[in-house]
């Protein structure tokens, strides 16, 4: 106690050790936002509109919009369903989101309702967590280049990078690569008075659901070739890549180190 006496109630005391590193400079990280929503979610359009209103000011934000968490729909891919693992075992819901798959419950105890990194998707929550993540340096680089052949609709993708700062678990890092598409129009979106445009929809995962193991200490370089389906609009397609830790027994230990 502040008066040097005994703590009258010591059951609420807790301590946590944190490592602090001082450097002259660091590489700015990109922050990964993974949204979970579906066409059957009546609350999702309002949440999407609110989030879309604040993201233009977030220059370092990378987005993926999984169609899972509340049933599935025409835009769902298997990998998105696999990520329902980040929900508590007793409850899935939408709209929901992950920010860098980070467990930030100690920093924001009022925002996190469950024992996993998943939280309700809202502009307020996003702004708070994005601001905190922008203060964390990138631990690895993620460099992305593409080569598009319009005649064959083939896309070559190169992803490379290396370690920037010490990493606690370098042997458990995985690379994830997605093809996403914007401006997908739906006439069956619950909660929308008319049609609704879906953004950042994963069309294909080029790596397994839980990523491809990479050695960031030696530097990594991966090449992918994919042919875009005829119904995919290449003008609205983009490649998303990120490196994250993977612990198959703990969804709170799968944080993203950097994205592109």
Residue ranges and their predicted role:
Residues 21, 40-43, 251-253:
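The N-terminal extracellular segments of secreted preproproteins, especially immediately downstream
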């Amino acid at each position: 106690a502040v008066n040097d006496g005994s703590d009258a109630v010591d059951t609420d005391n807790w301590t946590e050790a944190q490592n602090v590193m001082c450097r002259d400079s660091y590489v700015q990280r990109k922050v990964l936002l993974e949204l979970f929503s579906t066409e059957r979610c009546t609350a999702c359009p309002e949440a999407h509109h609110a989030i879309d209103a604040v993201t233009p000011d977030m220059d370092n934000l990378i987005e993926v919009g999984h169609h899972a968490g509340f049933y599935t729909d025409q835009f769902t891919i298997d990998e998105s369903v696999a990520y329902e693992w980040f929900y508590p075992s007793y409850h899935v819901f939408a709209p929901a989101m992950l920010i860098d798959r980070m467990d930030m419950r100690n920093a924001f105890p009022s925002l996190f309702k469950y024992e996993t990194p998943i939280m309700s998707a809202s502009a307020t929550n996003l702004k708070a967590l994005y601001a905190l993540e922008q203060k964390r340096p990138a631990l690895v680089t993620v460099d992305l280049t593409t080569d598009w052949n319009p005649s064959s609709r083939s896309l070559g993708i190169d992803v490379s990078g290396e370690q920037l700062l010490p990493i606690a678990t370098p042997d458990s890092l995985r690379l994830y690569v997605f093809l996403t598409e914007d401006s997908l129009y739906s006439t069956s979106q619950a909660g929308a008075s008319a049609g609704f445009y879906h953004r950042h929809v994963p069309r294909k995962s080029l790596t397994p659901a839980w990523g491809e193991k990479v050695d960031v200490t030696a530097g990594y370089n991966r090449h992918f070739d994919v042919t875009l389906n005829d119904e995919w609009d290449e003008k609205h397609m983009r490649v998303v890549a990120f490196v994250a830790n993977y612990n198959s027994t703990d969804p709170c230990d799968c944080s993203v180190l950097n994205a592109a």
